[in-house]
Amino acid sequence: MSQNGSSTYSTAGVGLYAQIAPNEDWTFVFGGQDATDIDGTSVQLNNFSDEHYTSFASLSYTPTIKGLGAGQYSVMLYNVPGVKKQPETTNGWSLNISQDLGEKLAIFGRVNGVSGHTATINQSYVLGAVYNNPLDRNPLDQIGLAFAYNKIDEDAVGSKLNHDSEKIIEGYWAWGISKWMTLTPDIQFYIDPASNPKSDYATVFTLRSTFFF
C-alpha cells in the first residue's frame, strides 16, 4: 500500500534536485532527470542531448503534535514528457499523510492520480493504520491494515476490463528477528479484480524478509 500505484515517473535516471528546508518542519524539493531511460536500467549520460527531462516538485510538513506525536504531510507534482518507450506526456500528483497517535498507533493515507493512458491505475486512494510492537517483544514488530480503491484505465491495460475499479484490503504482520531482520507475512484480498473474468474476488499471499545493516 505504500507505493504510488498511478506513478508514471521513471524509477531511476541521471538528474539533479535541490532541497530547501527553512526550518525543521518544512521541506521543499524540486528537480528533474533524464526521461529517456524509463526503467533506469543503467547510468546513461548520452541522452541529455535529446532534451527529454522529467520534472518534479514536492512540499513536506513534518510537525510533532503535542499529545499525538510525529506526523508527515506532503504533496508532490510531476511531469513526464513523451519518449520512445513511453510516448504519451503525463502529469501526476500525490497527496500523502501519516500521523502518530501515541507511542504505538499510527494512521496513514494517500490520494494520487495521473493524466493520460500510460499507467494502468489512473487514480488511487489508500487509508490504513499500523500498530507498533503489539506484544512488547521487539521494536521491529508491526501490524498493518489498509484499504485501497483503484480506478483502472482500460486503454492502458490494453484489454477489456471486467471491472473499472478494484477494492483491496491488505493486512500484514512484520515479525522482528533480533535487531537485523524482519519476516513479514502479507495478505491482499481483491474485490472486483479488473482483469479476472472468472471471479469477483482474488487473494494474494506474500512472505517478505527485510535485513537491516
Regions of interest found by a model, annotated:
Residues 8, 46-51, 82-89, 114-124, ...:
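Solvent-exposed loop/turn segments connecting transmembrane beta-strands
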